[in-house]
């Protein structure tokens, strides 16, 4: 695959108002993607655009709109809406393209652009390369004549539509009556729709992270900072806590004791429940190289398989589609239930967990830990430039670490696709050895990254 100049593992992402997350780049994305997804017939073409609650969304959105309308595409604006909601609305409105403006779990200063095809799935690497090629060419050719410019309209009921779609995924005849739930929306895109969905299903809802101001998205809240959720669960004696990230495509949960449960455990719970109901497809689960070995062992004990992909929920979804799987995701909390959505959806995954809990006579603490994870250690090393992983010293440290584990665990070292970080992960039954090999690899990376 050719090297991509703009797109990473999850669209284009970076600090707002710095390359590549500038108004100029957003304009070029709109023009290039618009040209690529407009067919040659004379019908009107449509793109839908949603965003999270970052201040910079007000800069990126009009730049994208200018790009799309300049090549003749009509635009529908949703305002704040979860990423999976944008994917759903792309399909339901029969749009040619869907766009989400978000940097997911990142700090407010970052932003990003994610693109969805007319089928509601994230674009392939090949499509992103085609867009990049058009962005780097002269874009003045093919501009719409004044009478063919795109028209723009704001859609006011998209949040209500998403709530209804989410509620429809909950088992018929079941409600959340009698359940007390803490929901942390990370001051992000789901700040209205997630609490409303739970409330309309009958739950008593304690809300946090529902006062976005443009700057506080993911700030000490949401799935990357679950302490706020855990504290409130214990304070209000809730049955469960749910924490979403800024664009609500991932989640973590906690039990009634405030103990946090990651994406691996959530996938195990849903897969086990669906397998018992005869609903699980593909004979197992798709996850990434970062998922815990304990998940693999848990599934194997139930005659189910774990298939691994590179990091990135779109790669998980691609493998799910190829192999006919309907449960997949990432340890970080992207959980994809392809019967229900075309991308990771934190709220829909939470509803499936809540259904299992409501139908059980056991507390969440008895359901949450489906398997015993093997000791796993992850460290991130920030670097300025260059390719630390190609350095001989790092390669030597990796080879020595593999020898020391001697087949009793796994090592995954990779460059982040969204931040200037090298992620070093090791896992195995010997916790002390795992910590040692991570320390040695991190030390080697730091030396060459300095």
From Swiss-Prot:
Enzyme nomenclature, EC number: 5.4.2.10
Cellular compartments per GO CC: cytosol
List of residues that carry Phosphoserine: 104
Active site per database record: 104
Post-translational modification: Activated by phosphorylation.
GO biological process, one term: UDP-N-acetylglucosamine biosynthetic process
Name of one Pfam family that matches: PGM_PMM_II
Domain of life: Bacteria
SUPFAM superfamilies according to UniProt: Phosphoglucomutase, C-terminal domain (SSF55957), Phosphoglucomutase, first 3 domains (SSF53738)
Disulfide bonds: none
Alphabetical keyword list: Isomerase, Magnesium, Metal-binding, Phosphoprotein
Cofactor note: Binds 1 Mg(2+) ion per subunit.
An MF annotation (GO) of this entry: phosphomannomutase activity
Binding locations of Mg(2+): 104, 245, 247, 249
Positions in coiled-coil regions: none
Cofactor(s) for this UniProt protein: Mg(2+)
Reaction equation(s) it catalyzes: alpha-D-glucosamine 1-phosphate = D-glucosamine 6-phosphate
Family: Belongs to the phosphohexose mutase family.
Function: Catalyzes the conversion of glucosamine-6-phosphate to glucosamine-1-phosphate.
NCBIfam families found in the cross-reference section: glmM (TIGR01455), PRK10887.1 (NF008139)
Stored HAMAP family: GlmM_B
Protein's UniProt name: Phosphoglucosamine mutase
The organism of origin for this protein: Phenylobacterium zucineum (strain HLK1)
Gene that specifies this protein: glmM
């Amino acid at each position: 695959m050719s090297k991509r100049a703009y797109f990473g593992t999850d669209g284009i992402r970076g600090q707002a108002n710095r390359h590549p997350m500038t108004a100029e780049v957003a304009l070029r994305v709109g023009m290039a993607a618009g040209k690529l997804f407009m067919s040659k017939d004379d019908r009107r073409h449509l793109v839908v655009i949603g965003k999270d609650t970052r201040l910079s969304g007000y800069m990126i959105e009009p730049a994208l709109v200018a790009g799309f309308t300049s090549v003749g595409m009509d635009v529908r604006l949703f305002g704040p809406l979860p990423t999976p909601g944008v994917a759903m609305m792309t399909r339901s409105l029969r749009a040619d393209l869907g766009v989400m403006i978000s940097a997911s779990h990142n700090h407010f200063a970052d932003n990003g652009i994610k693109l969805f095809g007319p089928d509601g799935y994230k674009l392939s690497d090949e499509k992103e390369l085609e867009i990049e090629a058009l962005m780097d060419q002269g874009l003045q050719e093919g501009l719409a004549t004044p009478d063919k410019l795109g028209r723009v309209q704001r859609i006011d009921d998209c949040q209500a539509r998403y709530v209804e779609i989410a509620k429809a995924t909950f088992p018929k005849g079941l409600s959340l009556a009698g359940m007390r739930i803490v929901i942390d929306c990370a001051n992000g895109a789901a700040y209205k729709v997630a609490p409303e969905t739970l409330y309309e299903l009958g739950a008593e809802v304690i809300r946090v992270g529902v006062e976005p101001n443009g700057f506080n998205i993911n700030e000490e809240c949401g799935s990357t900072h679950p302490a706020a959720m855990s504290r409130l669960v214990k304070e209000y004696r809730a049955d469960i806590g749910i924490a979403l990230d800024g664009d609500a495509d991932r989640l973590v949960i906690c039990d009634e004791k405030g103990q946090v449960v990651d994406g691996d455990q959530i996938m195990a719970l849903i897969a086990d429940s669906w397998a018992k109901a005869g609903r699980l497809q593909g004979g197992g689960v798709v996850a990434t190289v970062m998922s815990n070995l304990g998940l693999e062992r848990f599934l194997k004990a139930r005659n189910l398989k774990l298939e691994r992909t590179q990091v990135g929920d779109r790669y998980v979804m691609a493998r799910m589609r190829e192999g006919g799987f309907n449960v997949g995701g990432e340890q970080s909390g992207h959980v994809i239930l392809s019967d229900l959505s075309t991308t990771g959806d934190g709220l829909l995954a939470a509803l499936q967990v809540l259904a299992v809990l409501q139908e059980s006579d056991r507390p969440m603490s008895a359901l949450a830990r489906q398997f015993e994870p093997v000791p796993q250690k992850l460290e991130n090393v920030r670097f300025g430039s260059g390719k630390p992983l190609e350095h001989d010293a790092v390669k030597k440290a990796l080879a020595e670490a593999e020898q020391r584990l001697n087949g009793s665990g796994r090592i995954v070292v990779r460059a982040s696709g969204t931040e200037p970080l090298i992620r070093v992960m090791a896992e195995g039954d010997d916790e002390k050895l795992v910590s040692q090999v991570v320390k040695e690899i991190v030390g080697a990376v730091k030396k060459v990254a300095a």
